Amino acid sequence: MVDYEREEEHTTPEQPKRSKKGYFLSSLIGVIVGAVLMAFIMPYLSNEGLDTGALDQQQNNNGRESIRTVNVSVNNAVTKIVSNMSPAVVGVVNIQKSDIWGESGEAGSGSGVIYKKNDHSAYVVTNHHVIEGASQIEISLKDGSRVSADLVGSDQLMDLAVLRVKSDKIKAVADFGNSDKVKSGEPVIAIGNPLGLEFAGSVTQGVISGTERAIPVDSNGDGQPDWNAEVLQTDAAINPGNSGGALLNMDGKVIGINSMKIAESAVEGIGLSIPSKLVIPVIEDLERYGKVKRPFLGIEMKSLSDIASYHWDETLKLPKNVTNGAVVMGVDAFSPAGKAGLKELDVITEFDGYKVNDIVDLRKRLYQKKVGDRVKVKFYRGGKEKSVDIKLSSADQLGS
């Protein structure tokens, strides 16, 4: 029997042909989707600088790129303050005779602040060290012009001086603010002429780093601090030419007169400014008297800590428990101290109820009093404690 194998025909179903209309719809949908996606992502590409289409649109008909001008407003509180106050901050030029022939030249320059004006005169406050030794002083105004200035008075202890100029060219006057209200962290602006008049009207900004800082000052040049200057500390850049310039609060008020800069190689510079509460009474005295009228004792002093310890017992005869005080090294017989009976080698340990640690302490308490005040002074003489009442006077009353 013969078996026949049956071949099965396997056929693939014929696919229906797409019409031209189908192709068109697919293409149209793809174009729409692509357009939507591009519209969505183009702003992001533009922000990243990849919007080539935008670049093409900035080209003119000659294929060159055009430049757009963008106006940005930069007016803020600082720029307004600077605009208003810059004309009130001036340059101060110290002119000295430089040789035996009497020729004069600029010995240095600093800054100053115009704080008062009347029909005839305007007054400028600056630092004593800026005008020290000057045979002639000039003021450089904001427009670059110079006017001659007269020295009204100066005070070495506070490092302040007052100048007077004719008022016809003065356009702006600064107002003082209350430095007692200044807080650490408060923003401030410094205006001055760092490193000379080439950088006139320079502006720096910072904050108050600290208030009531005490900086030792050697007022008589003997190499020993005899006074602590109370200053504001700021991180606003203050360079040597800034001396006498203004430290402003955000109300545009002068809260300090820039005076010193402490700079060390390992730290940032520290800007220091004399607070307005101390500036105002000094310049008022300088205007009125040409000097500051302070109460004085009429003695030369040295801190006990600066005296060799073996003298404490052998020469001064001090008890073992007395380790601080101010030693009287000399007395004017007609001074308040001389009239009260203080003598050389007396050791002052208490002034007006306050302990005296050294001569800095004593001067601090003394300058807080007024001419005419009476104070009680305790001291040691020959190992015994004594006390006297002293009526304070000013130096110009000596002998009266």
UniProtKB/Swiss-Prot annotation:
The cysteines joined by S-S bonds are none
What's the protein's topology in the membrane? Answer: Single-pass membrane protein
Q: Which InterPro entries match?
A: Chloro_Bact_Ser_Proteases, PDZ, PDZ_sf, Peptidase_S1_PA, Peptidase_S1_PA_chymotrypsin, Peptidase_S1C
- The EC code for this enzyme is 3.4.21.-
For this protein, the record's Pfam families field holds: PDZ_2, Trypsin_2
Give the Gene Ontology MF terms in alphabetical order. serine-type endopeptidase activity
What family name appears in the similarity comment? Belongs to the peptidase S1C family.
Protein name per the record: Uncharacterized serine protease YyxA
- This chain's source organism reads Bacillus subtilis (strain 168)
* Encoding gene (name): yyxA
